[in-house]
Design a protein with these regions (language model features):
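N-terminal active-site segment of His-dependent metallophosphoesterases
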Residues: 1-77
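Residue-level marker for buried hydrophobic side chains located in beta-strands
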Residues: 13-15, 63-65, 96-97, 205, ...
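Generic beta-strand structural signal
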Residues: 15, 65, 154-155, 322-324
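Active-site glycine-centered loops adjacent to acidic/histidine catalytic or metal-binding residues
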Residues: 18, 67-68, 99-100, 163, ...
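Extended active-site neighborhood of metal-dependent phosphoesterases/phosphodiesterases
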Residues: 26-39, 72-199, 203, 217-235, ...
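Active-site charged/polar residues at nucleotide-handling catalytic sites that mediate phosphoryl
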Residues: 58-59, 198, 248
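Histidine-centered catalytic micro-motifs
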Residues: 205-212, 251-261
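A short C-terminal boundary segment appended to hydrolase-like catalytic domains
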Residues: 301-357
Length: 357
């Protein structure tokens, strides 16, 4: 990805996932109204436009999209009529990772939509033929039998890796093993090779379902609070990737899937606090879709003790400023969610740290 000239050595990476509501059009006539743009329970167009404008105001060098860019199943027409309307102006800077809503069927809340297996996602980001067939290579990585959109790129002194964790899909033969030679195992081997050959000082990796959750009060209080991928089959990949990144001294992991903002303490692969060698995790799933609820204890503390700070009342994008050997983060709300508290827009989280390399 071409980088614009800079007068200094800092770069801006905007990061967010879980963004665009399903448009209310003829193709989605059977979808319940509560799941489409215009539903009062969703952020809808107002939220996705607010977060897009917030990201644009950051003047980013790149935009890390953390999956579930388009609900409910990410058809190409959905991308064109919803995501594109708000986020299209940043398209050439967007470096996406897919989410479950781009691959899997959606059969909840009275809906029954066929999974797209990544077709709409790749067609939107990589371009497509006149017949709508996605191009095999492009901005979202390769769309082939041997590679389903994992890739890496450099921004300044930073190496950034985008991964596809949607292994419980036809594209991956519904195979979430990282060791059996299947497609996910090949992706995991690619990650190991990519990290071994990296010569940049600092590394960020991102994918959709998080390794460590802030949403599930049961899993958050286990001795190992890792129930990766929010108790899903994708957890095998999340665990394996965290081990590789930890061994390679990666600096940050970014995820979406859980619809709020949460920052975690540096952790080892078992979910233990590790201030010396651990990797901080940021969940930034506050791009526009209906917000989730953080898991808390009776005293108001977070159920997962590794959560430092979090908010589930507003939509927003995280700004990462990448320096040569350090970084800073800044998260500010862009729009309050439905039924938000009076203090929702006063939340903020910012800080800085050195990169691990």
């Amino acid at each position: 990805m071409p980088q614009p000239p800079h007068g200094d050595t800092s770069y801006t990476l905007a990061a967010v996932g879980d963004i665009a509501c399903e448009p209310d059009d003829a193709q989605n006539a059977a979808t319940p109204a509560a799941l489409k743009c215009g539903s009062p329970s969703l952020g809808g167009f107002s939220a996705e436009f607010a977060t897009a404008q917030q990201a644009d105001a950051m003047h980013p060098d790149a935009v890390a999209l953390l999956g579930d860019e388009q609900y409910e199943v990410g058809k190409l027409t959905d991308f064109e009529q919803s995501f594109e309307q708000a986020w299209g102006g940043l398209k050439m800077l967007e470096r996406p990772a897919p989410g479950n809503h781009e691959y899997y069927a959606y059969t909840k809340k009275g809906d029954n939509e066929v999974g797209q297996n990544g077709t709409g996602y790749f067609a939107y980001f990589n371009g497509h033929t006149q017949a709508g067939t996605p191009n095999a290579q492009g901005q979202a990585g390769d769309d082939t039998a041997a590679n389903q959109g994992w890739y890496s790129y450099n921004v300044g002194n930073w190496h950034i890796v985008s991964l596809n964790i949607e292994c419980n899909s036809a594209a991956f033969n519904n195979d979430c093993s990282t060791t059996d030679g299947g497609l996910l195992a090949q992706e995991t081997q690619w990650l190991a090779t990519d990290l071994a050959s990296n010569r940049q000082a600092c590394t960020i990796a991102y994918w959709h379902q998080p390794t460590f959750t802030a949403a599930d009060p049961v899993s958050a209080t286990l001795p190992n609070p890792s129930v990766p991928g929010a108790d899903s089959a994708e957890g095998l990949a999340a665990d394996a990737w965290w081990k590789l990144l930890y061994k390679s001294h990666a600096t940050l992991v970014l995820n979406g899937h859980e619809h709020y903002y949460a920052r975690f303490r540096p952790m080892d692969p078992a979910g233990n606090y590790d201030p010396r060698n651990g990797i901080p995790q940021f969940i930034v799933g506050s791009g526009g879709e209906a917000l989730d609820t953080l898991a808390t204890n009776a005293d108001g503390s977070y159920s997962n003790p590794n959560v430092v700070t979090a908010q589930d009342q507003a939509y927003g994008v995280m700004k990462l400023t990448l320096h040569e050997h350090s970084y800073s983060w800044d998260y500010q709300p862009a729009l309050a969610g439905p039924n938000a508290s009076a203090t929702a827009m006063s939340y903020s989280d910012s800080g800085s740290a050195s990169c691990r390399g």
